[in-house]
């Protein structure tokens, strides 16, 4: 993956792994896919890492199963997967799910180092494609205050939207009271309903900012 989202970890993101460990091992298990009876595959669901930044995923998209009817993939919208146009032209139903975890500066912090301007530009390219486009928000302490802006954005741009509440890392859960969630108590039933975790949250963010080389003033 080419992103080091604060809601992710090194087991999913090679970007985070490379920041935390210079000898971070990258395991290529793509043979497990190619050894499947691909002629029996009619639907393919591609999850992260980031498909647009993976050579393995690109190879899969260029050599899809012969009887494939539908394809869904998620993306952080840092890049455009241009192969999708050709896939649609083959009569395959394509759904693109874009991770939308904030607007503007909130996006840039939560989904570091992906920049909002690039994200938005690529999102509009996907919107112009002949694909089914939807957006997904993982609601955490870092973006709960921006959730209303996210809803406004998807409505203005006529985008399908779904969301779920983050469970891990637990320190970023909206269930705790802290400087981010307290102002949003009542927005959802579970927001800021449990103990104050400001101390743990600050320690977590300081460590994560340091790993990414982010000035804490941007938080």
Predicted stretch roles:
Residues 25-35, 59-60:
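Helicase-associated low-complexity regulatory tails and linkers flanking the ATPase motor
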Residues 9-28, 39-54, 66-82, 90-121, ...:
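Core AdoMet radical
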Residues 1-25, 37-38, 192-219:
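N-terminal pre-core extensions flanking Radical SAM catalytic domains
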Residues 61, 111-115, 149-151:
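Short secondary-structure boundary/capping segments
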Residues 35-36, 88:
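A general structural signal for stabilizing positions within well-ordered secondary structure
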Residues 64, 87, 126-129:
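Hydrophobic helix-cap positions at the C-terminus of alpha-helices
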Residues 72, 92-97, 117-219:
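Conserved C-terminal portion of the radical SAM core fold
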Residues 56-62, 82-88, 146-148:
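Distinct, well-ordered alpha-helical segments
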């Amino acid at each position: 993956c080419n992103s080091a989202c604060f809601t992710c970890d090194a087991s999913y993101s090679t970007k985070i792994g490379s920041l935390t460990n210079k000898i971070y091992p990258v395991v290529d298990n793509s043979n497990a896919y190619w050894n499947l009876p691909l002629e029996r595959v009619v639907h393919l669901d591609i999850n992260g890492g980031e498909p647009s930044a993976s050579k393995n995923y690109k190879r899969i998209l260029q050599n899809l199963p012969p009887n494939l009817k539908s394809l869904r993939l998620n993306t952080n919208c840092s890049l455009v997967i241009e192969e999708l146009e050709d896939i649609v032209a083959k009569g395959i139903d394509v759904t693109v799910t874009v991770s939308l975890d904030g607007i503007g500066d909130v996006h840039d912090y939560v989904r570091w180092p992906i920049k909002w301007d690039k994200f938005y530009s690529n999102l509009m390219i996907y919107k112009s494609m002949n694909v089914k486009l939807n957006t997904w928000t993982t609601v955490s302490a870092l973006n709960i205050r921006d959730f209303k802006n996210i809803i406004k954005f998807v409505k203005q741009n006529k985008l399908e939207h779904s969301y779920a509440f983050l469970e891990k890392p637990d320190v970023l859960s909206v269930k705790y009271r802290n400087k981010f969630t307290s102002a949003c108590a009542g927005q959802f039933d579970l927001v800021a309903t449990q103990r104050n975790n400001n101390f743990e949250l600050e320690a977590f963010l300081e460590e994560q900012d340091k790993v990414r080389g982010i000035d804490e003033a941007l938080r």
